[in-house]
Amino acid sequence: MKNIIITGGLGYIGTELCKIYSGVSWNHKITVIDNRFISERVNQLRNWNINFVHGDILDKGLINKYCKDADIVHHLAGITDVPRVKKDSNDSIDNQIIMVGEKGTQNILDVISDKCKIIFPSTHVVYEGLDKVKNDINEDENTKPVLAYAISKANNEKQLKDSGKNYIILRLGSVYGYSTDTARIDIMPNLFSKIASQNGTLKLFSGGRQVKSLVPLIDVARCFKYMEERNDIS
């Protein structure tokens, strides 16, 4: 039996991951930590034998209580409702995004044991400042974040690499897909689907030659579960 923690378990990826764990939740101790309380979803978690803790990753005492004996931490919590372009940003918003990401991640790293595996979702936008489009980027490419969300993720990657802990970083493309619990209409494919279903018209610029990295939500959730299962991947 593993002691598994999912921070941000009521979010877009976390919700789908919990659905996958619902099939094996009786074989493990699974706890979701989220600073939101959505009664229907919390009740569903409890029906799946998944514990719910209403709390924040910035609360180090709470993180210590639940993470110190963890075998696995899926660290999904953080601010995701972020500015997509520089003109929508300001110092206050940027500082909050970076602070929550860094402090929350450090709180977890400070209390987990060396045997614990922490699995973290980074993002392809850590490359957003590259001077030209590349189709063959791998994990050894130097990152070049510009906006606060990407800067926060790049900083979190460094925290994990410098921690000496057992970690896995997944640099995800733009996650998309239908979720019965969480709508993310701000994501391009989801927005396109909504417009198309309403007989809307999509306007393409630059001849429709834009390139975007996409990955289905269900595949991301399955990947997190797979990373938890494989002891030879770290």
Walk through the language-model features, giving the residues of each.
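Conserved Rossmann-fold NAD(P)-dependent oxidoreductase catalytic core, especially the SDR/UDP-sugar
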Residues: 106-146
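NAD(P)-dependent short-chain dehydrogenase/reductase
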Residues: 158-212, 217-226
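Glycine-rich NAD(P)-binding loop of the Rossmann-fold in SDR/ketoreductase-type enzymes
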Residues: 58, 92, 96-107, 143, ...
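Rossmann-fold cofactor-recognition segment
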Residues: 47-58
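Conserved glycine-rich Rossmann-like NAD(P)H-binding loop of the short-chain dehydrogenase/reductase
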Residues: 26-37
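SDR active-site strand-loop-helix element
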Residues: 7, 33, 73-77, 118-124, ...
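N-terminal Rossmann NAD(P)H-binding glycine-rich loop of SDR-like oxidoreductase domains
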Residues: 4-24
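NAD(P)H-binding glycine-rich loop region in Rossmannoid oxidoreductase-like domains
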Residues: 57-100
